[in-house]
Structure formats: C-alpha cells, structure tokens
C-alpha cells in the first residue's frame, strides 16, 4: 500500500479521526477520498472506509459491495491481501441484515483465504452444515 497516495492519506486521516471519536470528520475524509479516486484500486479503498461509517446497515452493505466490485476490477495483485477484510465486512453486513446464507458465503470466502471469523448470529451447527 502506497501511503503517499492521496486517497490512502485521506483514509489514514479518517482512521485517525475515527480513533479520536470524531465520526463526522472521519466520514468527511473518507468521502473526499471517494470523490478524488482515479482508478479501481483507489475506489476499492475509499469505498471500504466509507462503509465503516454509514448510518444504516443497507448503506453499509452497498458500500461494501461497491468496494468488492472495484477490487475485482483491479487487474493486478494490489488488492489480494485486502480481499479477506472485504469478505468479512460483507459477511457482517449480510449477517446484520439477517441474510445468514449470504453471510456464510462471504465468511467462507474469507476463511478460504486464511481469515477465520466466528459469525455471531449464525448458529455454529448451521454454519458448518450448510453447503456452499
């Protein structure tokens, strides 16, 4: 990740603001990152961070889907290490919205890349026994 990239710098500033409990300031940094993105890599990063501070679960899901869409449009390995996080966020979005089948799908995609997550609202027996 190129920390000299303006989109990444804005996302780092947004993260700093988040840790300082300044959510509106953080959201503004992430929104600015989205507005200045020039390629799919930058769009993926900005959308991922924008998803974190949405006011509704539906909006969070949409931004997470946008991030994944742009990740898939990147034609190199630059987002590969980022995919587990995108999958986990999508899993959590679907779980929050009560769509356990979709949640399980994305949690399993993350697990296939080495990141295991325990779903909070999906009974473990259902999670293990459902087929992909």
What are these regions (language model features)?
Residues 40-80:
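Alpha-helical adaptor scaffolds
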Residues 8-25:
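Alpha-helical segment of the N-proximal tetratricopeptide repeat
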Residues 10, 44-47, 87:
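TPR repeat positional signature
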């Amino acid at each position: 990740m190129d920390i000299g990239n303006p989109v990444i710098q804005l996302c780092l500033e947004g993260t700093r603001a988040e840790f300082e409990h300044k959510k509106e300031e953080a959201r503004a940094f992430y929104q600015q990152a989205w507005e200045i993105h020039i390629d799919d890599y930058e769009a993926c990063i900005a959308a991922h961070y924008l998803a974190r501070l949405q006011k509704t679960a539906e909006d969070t899901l949409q931004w997470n889907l946008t991030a994944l869409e742009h990740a898939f449009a990147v034609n190199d390995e630059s987002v590969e290490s980022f995919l587990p996080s995108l999958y986990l966020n999508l899993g959590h979005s679907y779980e929050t919205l009560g769509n356990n089948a979709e949640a399980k799908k994305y949690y399993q995609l993350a697990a296939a890349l080495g990141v295991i997550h325990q779903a909070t609202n999906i009974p473990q027996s259902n999670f293990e026994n459902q087929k992909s």
